[in-house]
A protein has these predicted regions:
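Conserved, mostly hydrophobic/aromatic
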Residues: 12, 22, 50, 87, ...
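Hydrophobic faces of well-ordered beta-strands that scaffold small-molecule active sites
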Residues: 20-24, 87-90, 105-109, 135-141
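Long hydrophobic segments that form regular secondary structure
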Residues: 93-116
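Acidic (Asp/Glu)-rich catalytic clusters
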Residues: 9-20, 101-102, 126-132
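Glycine-rich, histidine-containing beta strand-loop boundary motifs that form or position
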Residues: 7, 16, 20, 24-28, ...
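Glycine-rich anion/phosphate-binding loops
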Residues: 1-11
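An alpha-helical appendage that flanks or caps ligand/catalytic pockets
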Residues: 36-83, 112-230
Protein backbone atom coordinates (compact mmCIF):
# COMPACT_ATOMS: atom_id res chain seq x y z
CA UNK A 1 0.00 0.00 0.00
CA UNK A 2 1.62 3.30 -1.09
CA UNK A 3 0.69 5.20 2.07
CA UNK A 4 2.19 2.51 4.30
CA UNK A 5 5.22 2.37 2.02
CA UNK A 6 5.65 6.13 2.42
CA UNK A 7 5.58 5.81 6.22
CA UNK A 8 8.01 2.86 6.20
CA UNK A 9 10.48 4.74 4.01
CA UNK A 10 10.15 7.86 6.16
CA UNK A 11 10.87 5.81 9.29
CA UNK A 12 13.97 4.25 7.70
CA UNK A 13 15.11 7.69 6.60
CA UNK A 14 14.98 8.91 10.21
CA UNK A 15 16.85 5.84 11.44
CA UNK A 16 19.55 6.43 8.81
CA UNK A 17 19.52 10.19 9.39
CA UNK A 18 19.04 11.13 5.76
CA UNK A 19 21.39 8.60 4.17
CA UNK A 20 18.57 6.63 2.53
CA UNK A 21 18.05 6.46 -1.24
CA UNK A 22 15.33 4.45 -3.00
CA UNK A 23 15.58 2.40 -6.20
CA UNK A 24 12.23 2.10 -7.97
CA UNK A 25 11.69 -1.31 -9.62
CA UNK A 26 8.63 -1.67 -11.89
CA UNK A 27 8.21 -5.43 -11.52
CA UNK A 28 5.15 -7.63 -11.72
CA UNK A 29 3.15 -8.28 -8.58
CA UNK A 30 3.06 -11.94 -7.41
CA UNK A 31 1.10 -14.04 -9.90
CA UNK A 32 0.83 -11.15 -12.34
CA UNK A 33 2.11 -10.67 -15.90
CA UNK A 34 1.38 -7.03 -16.67
CA UNK A 35 2.57 -5.07 -19.69
CA UNK A 36 5.49 -2.69 -19.23
CA UNK A 37 3.11 0.23 -19.79
CA UNK A 38 0.88 -0.95 -16.93
CA UNK A 39 3.83 -1.52 -14.61
CA UNK A 40 5.26 1.93 -15.33
CA UNK A 41 1.86 3.52 -14.78
CA UNK A 42 1.59 1.81 -11.39
CA UNK A 43 5.10 3.01 -10.50
CA UNK A 44 4.17 6.52 -11.57
CA UNK A 45 1.14 6.49 -9.28
CA UNK A 46 3.10 5.09 -6.33
CA UNK A 47 5.76 7.79 -6.74
CA UNK A 48 3.15 10.55 -6.89
CA UNK A 49 1.54 9.22 -3.70
CA UNK A 50 4.92 8.99 -1.96
CA UNK A 51 5.69 12.59 -2.82
CA UNK A 52 2.29 13.76 -1.59
CA UNK A 53 2.75 11.86 1.66
CA UNK A 54 6.20 13.32 2.26
CA UNK A 55 5.40 16.94 1.40
CA UNK A 56 1.76 17.42 2.47
CA UNK A 57 -0.42 16.71 5.48
CA UNK A 58 -2.87 14.74 3.33
CA UNK A 59 -3.00 12.37 0.36
CA UNK A 60 -5.52 13.09 -2.37
CA UNK A 61 -4.91 10.92 -5.43
CA UNK A 62 -7.04 9.21 -8.06
CA UNK A 63 -5.44 7.08 -10.77
CA UNK A 64 -5.83 3.82 -12.65
CA UNK A 65 -4.47 1.68 -9.81
CA UNK A 66 -4.96 3.77 -6.67
CA UNK A 67 -7.77 5.97 -5.38
CA UNK A 68 -6.75 7.46 -2.03
CA UNK A 69 -8.06 10.34 0.02
CA UNK A 70 -6.35 10.32 3.39
CA UNK A 71 -6.09 13.07 5.96
CA UNK A 72 -3.64 12.46 8.76
CA UNK A 73 -2.92 14.01 12.13
CA UNK A 74 0.42 12.22 12.08
CA UNK A 75 2.26 13.60 9.03
CA UNK A 76 4.56 11.23 7.15
CA UNK A 77 7.66 13.40 7.08
CA UNK A 78 11.03 11.86 6.21
CA UNK A 79 14.31 13.04 7.69
CA UNK A 80 15.23 14.59 4.35
CA UNK A 81 13.03 17.65 4.02
CA UNK A 82 13.87 18.37 0.37
CA UNK A 83 11.05 16.19 -0.90
CA UNK A 84 12.21 12.93 0.62
CA UNK A 85 14.95 10.42 -0.24
CA UNK A 86 16.45 10.51 -3.71
CA UNK A 87 14.63 8.22 -6.13
CA UNK A 88 16.70 6.08 -8.52
CA UNK A 89 15.12 4.55 -11.60
CA UNK A 90 16.22 2.35 -14.50
CA UNK A 91 14.34 1.56 -17.69
CA UNK A 92 15.08 1.71 -21.40
CA UNK A 93 11.64 2.08 -22.98
CA UNK A 94 10.22 5.51 -23.74
CA UNK A 95 7.58 5.30 -20.94
CA UNK A 96 10.26 4.28 -18.44
CA UNK A 97 12.61 7.10 -19.40
CA UNK A 98 9.75 9.59 -19.29
CA UNK A 99 8.71 8.44 -15.82
CA UNK A 100 12.25 8.93 -14.55
CA UNK A 101 12.53 12.33 -16.22
CA UNK A 102 9.31 13.56 -14.61
CA UNK A 103 9.59 12.19 -11.09
CA UNK A 104 12.96 10.65 -10.21
CA UNK A 105 16.39 12.01 -9.33
CA UNK A 106 18.89 9.53 -10.79
CA UNK A 107 18.64 7.51 -14.01
CA UNK A 108 20.41 4.17 -13.61
CA UNK A 109 21.99 2.36 -16.55
CA UNK A 110 23.57 -1.02 -17.20
CA UNK A 111 26.86 -1.52 -19.08
CA UNK A 112 27.04 -0.47 -22.71
CA UNK A 113 29.36 1.31 -25.11
CA UNK A 114 30.23 4.90 -24.27
CA UNK A 115 28.32 6.04 -27.35
CA UNK A 116 25.13 4.27 -26.32
CA UNK A 117 25.38 5.43 -22.70
CA UNK A 118 25.79 8.99 -23.92
CA UNK A 119 22.68 8.57 -26.07
CA UNK A 120 20.59 7.41 -23.11
CA UNK A 121 21.83 10.30 -20.99
CA UNK A 122 21.03 12.86 -23.67
CA UNK A 123 17.56 11.37 -24.19
CA UNK A 124 16.66 11.43 -20.49
CA UNK A 125 18.15 14.91 -20.06
CA UNK A 126 15.95 16.24 -22.86
CA UNK A 127 12.89 14.58 -21.38
CA UNK A 128 13.67 16.04 -17.95
CA UNK A 129 14.17 19.52 -19.42
CA UNK A 130 10.66 19.33 -20.87
CA UNK A 131 9.42 19.01 -17.27
CA UNK A 132 11.68 21.81 -16.06
CA UNK A 133 13.91 19.33 -14.24
CA UNK A 134 17.44 17.93 -14.23
CA UNK A 135 18.34 14.30 -13.60
CA UNK A 136 21.65 12.80 -12.46
CA UNK A 137 22.99 9.52 -13.81
CA UNK A 138 24.35 6.29 -12.39
CA UNK A 139 25.94 3.19 -13.92
CA UNK A 140 25.83 -0.28 -12.44
CA UNK A 141 28.81 -2.30 -13.65
CA UNK A 142 31.08 -4.96 -12.17
CA UNK A 143 34.79 -4.24 -11.61
CA UNK A 144 37.72 -6.62 -12.08
CA UNK A 145 40.84 -4.74 -11.03
CA UNK A 146 44.37 -6.11 -10.61
CA UNK A 147 47.86 -4.61 -10.47
CA UNK A 148 48.31 -5.12 -14.23
CA UNK A 149 45.99 -5.37 -17.21
CA UNK A 150 47.27 -8.87 -17.93
CA UNK A 151 46.41 -10.03 -14.41
CA UNK A 152 42.97 -8.43 -14.62
CA UNK A 153 42.16 -10.12 -17.92
CA UNK A 154 43.36 -13.45 -16.55
CA UNK A 155 41.11 -13.03 -13.50
CA UNK A 156 38.16 -12.26 -15.76
CA UNK A 157 38.71 -15.37 -17.85
CA UNK A 158 39.09 -17.50 -14.73
CA UNK A 159 35.60 -16.45 -13.62
CA UNK A 160 34.01 -18.16 -16.62
CA UNK A 161 36.62 -20.85 -17.30
CA UNK A 162 34.36 -23.65 -16.06
CA UNK A 163 31.05 -22.20 -17.19
CA UNK A 164 28.67 -24.51 -19.01
CA UNK A 165 26.80 -22.35 -21.54
CA UNK A 166 23.64 -24.44 -21.27
CA UNK A 167 23.57 -23.95 -17.50
CA UNK A 168 24.37 -20.26 -17.95
CA UNK A 169 21.37 -19.86 -20.24
CA UNK A 170 19.15 -21.63 -17.71
CA UNK A 171 20.37 -19.31 -14.95
CA UNK A 172 19.64 -16.22 -17.05
CA UNK A 173 16.20 -17.41 -18.09
CA UNK A 174 15.14 -18.14 -14.49
CA UNK A 175 15.56 -14.50 -13.50
CA UNK A 176 12.39 -12.44 -13.12
CA UNK A 177 13.78 -9.76 -15.45
CA UNK A 178 14.86 -12.24 -18.15
CA UNK A 179 12.43 -10.92 -20.77
CA UNK A 180 12.83 -7.19 -20.16
CA UNK A 181 14.14 -4.72 -22.72
CA UNK A 182 17.16 -3.97 -20.54
CA UNK A 183 18.22 -7.62 -20.46
CA UNK A 184 17.69 -7.89 -24.23
CA UNK A 185 19.99 -4.90 -24.73
CA UNK A 186 22.63 -6.56 -22.55
CA UNK A 187 22.46 -9.61 -24.82
CA UNK A 188 22.85 -7.40 -27.91
CA UNK A 189 25.92 -5.79 -26.40
CA UNK A 190 27.41 -9.20 -25.66
CA UNK A 191 26.78 -10.34 -29.25
CA UNK A 192 28.73 -7.34 -30.58
CA UNK A 193 31.81 -8.16 -28.50
CA UNK A 194 35.09 -9.48 -29.89
CA UNK A 195 36.49 -12.99 -29.44
CA UNK A 196 37.63 -12.19 -25.88
CA UNK A 197 34.28 -10.68 -24.93
CA UNK A 198 35.19 -6.98 -25.08
CA UNK A 199 32.64 -4.69 -26.74
CA UNK A 200 35.14 -1.83 -26.45
CA UNK A 201 38.39 -1.39 -24.49
CA UNK A 202 37.93 -2.39 -20.80
CA UNK A 203 34.23 -3.36 -21.16
CA UNK A 204 34.05 -7.15 -20.83
CA UNK A 205 30.66 -8.74 -21.46
CA UNK A 206 31.31 -12.44 -20.83
CA UNK A 207 30.08 -12.21 -17.24
CA UNK A 208 26.60 -11.83 -18.75
CA UNK A 209 26.76 -15.41 -19.99
CA UNK A 210 25.99 -16.60 -16.45
CA UNK A 211 23.65 -13.98 -15.06
CA UNK A 212 20.70 -11.81 -15.98
CA UNK A 213 20.67 -8.08 -15.41
CA UNK A 214 23.96 -6.20 -15.27
CA UNK A 215 26.05 -8.26 -17.67
CA UNK A 216 29.46 -6.64 -18.07
CA UNK A 217 32.53 -5.58 -16.11
CA UNK A 218 35.30 -3.04 -16.39
CA UNK A 219 38.59 -4.96 -16.58
CA UNK A 220 42.05 -3.48 -16.13
CA UNK A 221 44.62 -2.01 -13.77
CA UNK A 222 43.62 0.81 -11.37
CA UNK A 223 44.73 3.63 -13.69
CA UNK A 224 42.89 2.13 -16.66
CA UNK A 225 39.67 1.69 -14.68
CA UNK A 226 39.90 5.22 -13.30
CA UNK A 227 40.42 6.66 -16.79
CA UNK A 228 37.51 4.67 -18.22
CA UNK A 229 35.12 5.81 -15.51
CA UNK A 230 36.09 9.42 -16.09
Amino acid sequence: HPAMLARTIATLDHILQGRLTINIISSDMPGEHASSEARYQRSREVIEILKQAWTQDFIDFKGEFYDLKLDTTDPIKPYQQNGGPLLYFGGYSAPGKDLCAQFCDVYLMWPDTEENLRGHMEDVSQRAAAYGRKVDFGLRIHLIVRETETEAKAAAQKLISKLDDVLGTEIRNRAQDAKTLGVALQAETREKSDAEGYVEPRVWTEIGRARSGCGAALVGDPDQIYAKIL
